[in-house]
From Swiss-Prot:
UniProt subunit comment: Interacts with alpha-tubulin. Interacts with SIRT2.
Name the record gives this protein: Protein BEX4
Single GO biological process annotation from the record: negative regulation of tubulin deacetylation
InterPro entries xrefs: BEX, TF_A-like/BEX
Modification after translation (UniProt): Ubiquitinated and degraded by the proteasome.
Entry's family note: Belongs to the BEX family.
One Pfam entry name: BEX
Region of interest called Interaction with SIRT2, as start-end residue ranges on this chain: 30-88
Keyword Nucleus included in the entry's annotation: yes
Role, per record: May play a role in microtubule deacetylation by negatively regulating the SIRT2 deacetylase activity toward alpha-tubulin and thereby participate in the control of cell cycle progression and genomic stability. In absence of reductive stress, acts as a pseudosubstrate for the CRL2(FEM1B) complex: associates with FEM1B via zinc, thereby preventing association between FEM1B and its substrates.
Major place of residence: cytoplasm
Region (Disordered): 14-50
GO CC terms: cytoplasm; microtubule; nucleus; spindle pole
Length: 118
């Protein structure tokens, strides 16, 4: 297909040169066509496609309960809020890891009494 485009451009330039030699002006339409075809020739396929990487965003805001702010409590409120954020992060991590840890079960208390594997 690229060779066909080059051939069309070559034909248009030859035609334009012939008209210029005869003294007549090349038609405006042929100039526009040759200009458009040159633009098409210079373009690379898929050159402007950007591939974005999807990153996992830690979405733990759903787990933070609505807080009623009492400005008279200063230090305790900060500690409580930090605890809530840590708990929310832990919950979100558990939710994200749930498909991977589905079949793992903890060992019972008497596991080593009955285990035959040394």
């Amino acid at each position: 297909m690229a060779s066909k485009v080059k051939q069309v451009i070559l034909d248009l330039t030859v035609e334009k040169d012939k008209k210029n030699k005869k003294g007549g002006k090349a038609s405006k339409q042929s100039e526009e066509e040759s200009h458009h075809l040159e633009e098409v020739e210079n373009k690379k396929p898929g050159g402007n496609v950007r591939r974005k990487v999807r990153r996992l965003v830690p979405n733990f805001l759903w787990a933070i309960p609505n807080r009623h702010v009492d400005h008279s409590e200063g230090g305790e409120e900060v500690g409580r809020f930090v605890g809530q954020v840590m708990e929310a992060k832990r919950k979100s991590k558990e939710q994200q890891m749930r498909p991977y840890t589905r079949f793992r079960t903890p060992e019972p208390d008497n596991h080593y009494d009955f285990c035959l594997i040394p």
